C-alpha cells in the first residue's frame, strides 16, 4: 500500500520527459521608448505587440513590455529587470541607438540574445565581442547613407552640410555620410549637432547656411527631426534637404507640416509598398503587416515594422531552439542565439540573411528613396 502513489507519479514523470524539452513558457522581454523624445518610434512598436500571437511552435509566449521613457539608464534598468526578475529568454529593444548600446551589457553578461530596434551599426559591430549576443532589425546607417550619397550625386550636389543628434545616432550618421559623400565626390563643408529635446536650432542652422552647402542632411530620428527642417524653411534655405530613415513615421509628417515638402530620405520598402512592383520580394510581407496594423491603429510606421520583423525572426528561430533545449535555461538562450545568427527570412523591410559577421543581414533590397509631397511619402523611381 505504501507504494500505490509511485506508479501514477512515475507515469506523470515519464509523460513530462516524453513531452520533450519545450514544456515551459517562452518569455520575451521588450523595452521601448513609449514615452519621451523618441515616443514616435516606441508607440507604434508598442502597438505592434498587440498584433502578435501568444504562441510559437505550439509553445505559449509571454510578451513582457516595459517603457524606458527614451532614457538610457532606464533602458538598462529594464533590461536587467527582464533578465533577473522575469527570466526572459530574449530581449527585444530598445527603440533608439543610445538605449540599445546601454542595454548590451546586461544581455551579454547574462548570455541573453537581444534584438535591437535601433539603426546604428555600432550596436552589432562584429569587432566588438559584446555583439555575439546582439542582433538588430533596422537597416544599418551605412546602407542608407550610401543611398543618400547616390541620390545627392544624381541631383548634382557637390557640397553638403550636416546637422544631427549629439549622441550615438547622430555621430554614427555623420561618420557614414562622410564616407559615402567622399566616395560620391561630395565635400562636407559644415557640421552641427543638437539634442533630441532642444526646442530651437537657430544658431546651428545659421552656421550651416553661412557655409552655403548645396544640400543639408539632418541626422535625426522621430519628431525631433522636424526641428532643423522647420528652421531651414523659416530661413528660406534653397538647397535640397535630406533626412535619414529615422523620421519615416506619420508623427514626423504631422509635426513638420508643409516645411517638410520636398525633403528626400531613404526608407524601408514597407512604407510605400503599394508603389512597388509586384515582383518586389518584401511586398507581400509588408502588405500583410501594414493591413493588420492600419486596421487597428491607423497610419503605418516603419518603426512598428521593425518590431514585427523581430517577431518574424523569432518565429523562425524559436522552433529551431526548441529542438535543443527547454525555455528558461541558458542552453535554450544559446540555441536561440545560434538560430538567429543563421536567419534567412523575408521581413517587412527586407530579406534578413545573417551570419557570424553580420547580425543584421539586410542588403539593397531593404531600401528605397522617397520624397515628401503634400504630407505623403512618394517613391522615387
Describe the role of every protein-language-model region.
Residues 3-14, 24-381:
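Extracytosolic ligand-binding ectodomains
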Residues 19-21:
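N-terminal signal peptide c-region/cleavage motif recognized by signal peptidases
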